[in-house]
Amino acid sequence: EIIIPETVKSISKDAFAECGRLECMEFAADGVKLYVPENPVYRKGEISSLFYRDNAGQLHYDYETYDSLLADWSQILIRCRMAAFRLEYPVQLPAARKRAYEALIAEHLKDLVYDICKRDSLMDLAALGNAGMITAEHIEEMIDWTTACRRGKLTGYLLEYQQEHFTENTFDFSL
């Protein structure tokens, strides 16, 4: 994790070009986190070109270009991860694109959950939950998939999510 102080006024657009393990960028001012796909060398410029400065010198992020990159990315699981983060933080996300992202994730949910298990990524599973893509219709299957992969942390997250979102609150007499 790299934390850049608010006092920093300028960062070179290539500052993180060689950060192979960079998975997520968080923009505190916008309240946004975006998934950064594993970049082949020839695509690194595309990600860094998403940043721009307005006339006042404020750094901004080009969400529209990010969304178009997402549509062009060849690996479906990376597209699903990018879509989950966009749904979790839908800054400047048109309704039609939101529906397309939800359909993409729903279509590839099983493969996506198995990929999350393979990488043991609670961050990606939480992104699905925060994006509203963990539904009452699919939660039991998702629990079965994470259990089959022997990922207790992920199964535990799903069980807690199920308890918080899909279980009716009944009075508990236990001590």
Identify the role of each PLM range:
Residues 125-128, 158:
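Conserved hydrophobic site in ankyrin repeats
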Residues 1-10, 20-37, 42-96, 102-119, ...:
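Structural signature of tandem-repeat unit edges
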Residues 153-175:
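Charge-dense, extended regions
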